[in-house]
Amino acid sequence: MSDRLTRIAIVSEDRCKPKKCRQECKKSCPVVKTGKLCIEVGSTSKSAFISEELCIGCGICVKKCPFEAIQIINLPKDLAKDTTHRYGANGFKLHRLPIPRPGQVLGLVGTNGIGKSTALKILAGKLKPNLGRFNTPPDWEEILTHFRGSELQSYFIRVVEENLKTAIKPQHVDYIKEVVRGNLGKMLEKLDERGLMEEICADMELNQVLEREARQVSGGELQRFAIAAVFVKKADIYMFDEPSSYLDVRQRLKAAQVIRSLLRHDSYVIVVEHDLSVLDYLSDFVCCLYGKPGAYGVVTLPFSVREGINVFLAGFIPTENLRFRDESLTFRVSETTQENDGEVKSYARYKYPNMTKQLGDFKLEVMEGEFTDSQIIVMLGENGTGKTTFIRMLAGAFPREEGVQSEIPEFNVSYKPQGNDSKRECTVRQLLHDKIRDACAHPQFMSDVIRPLQIEQLMDQVVKTLSGGEKQRVAITLCLGKPADIYLIDEPSAHLDSEQRITASKVIKRFILHAKKTAFIVEHDFIMATYLADRVIVYEGQPAVKCIAHSPQSLLSGMNHFLSHLNITFRRDPTNFRPRINKLESIKDKEQKTAGSYYYLDD
């Protein structure tokens, strides 16, 4: 019996359409043929029901289902117990819970759809854990008995008896536009229970947007408002779901400092974050989540920050002797980096001249530069310094006479914009067929781009129903599939989880090398930027007023230039070479600043 309990059947209610198929799963099931009701499809039911007790794990129904709605998953043996919550029969289930500790920041790291948001809801007291018994959910007394002897018991006793107040920053800040009416300043005044509104507005640079309404501000401003709205509340548990999306590097670190300032000896702070360098800087300890997205998730025991992130990247949990990913993820700096600028001159292929562009009150000056084939140039700068404007200038989006002082060469350009909120009614298959039919038929493109980005699973879904991360993967595929000289990609990491970011980086890098093209990329995730960059363009100046885009320079000198303005130093982790931010005023931080080496390549 123990063998059978470690198998779960997942039926996706979105994909399963019993009225549109011949119920192939039921007809082909060998257990049903023996007369047992392993798979049932009622005349009124919206999806099939699979009995996990009767299922023998043959996997025939998985192959036969025309909508790919079924997953049969064999779990590790020790997952027969410790179920915290399950969303109904054949639904997602979560094993164990992260363990928050008062006075410390708990970081959660894991892929999308693995149960991080479910864990947050349970810890916030918004969702009562059913311990896997969705038909007869237990009461709080039974739940506390289940967790007895662990740190979670004392935590849940406080949640139930003391009515702990929770303040949550949601994952998708775009929804604030639909909910909040009136200007942001008045909204923040209403929420201010700690009298800290002026302080947080100065810290998060919100003073200039307080008179505006939610629908008039950018994603980054909305994110900073959402963090401020949680900060001014008087609460016992503070939760932040992806606080760094839409923010630039400087704002991410400021947000991290603001979140850490919420710590009291009796308060809990929990953060879900996909930018690993920010998570590293922010957290005191980390819980990893692994499993199969949309099917089941397992929470590990707490690790120290460095060890936890390294465990996640290695894909192996030493405490449980369990491998949850086939390969480990490491960060070697770009193999094609040209260190000295003289080397580029010898085979420079393209040049662009000095340019200026006036857009309303904003003026951008671009210093002349050059680039070669098979090269990725990453643009580093704060929000509002004209990175997207420069991309559009190269793409020829502005008329020639409108302030460009000298001719820009004619480049055939493929452009992926920053936002990708597509409202198209067609399926992903139709969209790819319309836009990049030739590329999709090419086996090299299939193996280099479509399979690693897992686009095949999305083919029959309607574009407007996709999640943010799924839309982002489709947008990257569309951009790379279009034949062009230059690929301009604006924030490829937005909405992607840590694992998908690394996959997307590898896909872009491999494609650019194979196709012998050039890519200009805007990226705020530091780990992804350093992995991608062959050369960097640094932007400096006053955002939204006047900025300068410097000529492309080597990764080391460009990063040093950029980080010296931000007053941050990085070191490299000896295990997997990922960049780690030094704590401000630490010995390592002072040493590197004295030596003038803000960024390390040689560890």
Swiss-Prot record:
SMART domains: AAA. The lineage of its organism: Eukaryota, Viridiplantae, Streptophyta, Embryophyta, Tracheophyta. This is ABC transporter E family member 1. It is found in: Membrane. Its main location: membrane. Residues 70-315, 344-566 form the ABC transporter domain. PROSITE patterns: 4FE4S_FER_1 (PS00198), 4FE4S_FER_2 (PS51379), ABC_TRANSPORTER_1 (PS00211), ABC_TRANSPORTER_2 (PS50893). One of its GO terms (cellular component) is membrane. The gene is ABCE1. Residues 7-39, 46-75 form the 4Fe-4S ferredoxin-type domain. It comes from Arabidopsis thaliana. One of its GO terms (molecular function) is metal ion binding. Disulfide bonds: none annotated. Belongs to the ABC transporter superfamily. ABCE family. Pfam families: ABC_tran, Fer4, Fer4_RLI. ATP binds at residues 110-117, 381-388. SUPFAM superfamilies: 4Fe-4S ferredoxins, P-loop containing nucleoside triphosphate hydrolases. Expressed in roots, stems, leaves, flowers and siliques. NCBIfam families: PRK13409.1 (NF009945). Keywords: 4Fe-4S, ATP-binding, Iron, Iron-sulfur, Membrane, Metal-binding, Nucleotide-binding, Repeat, Transport.
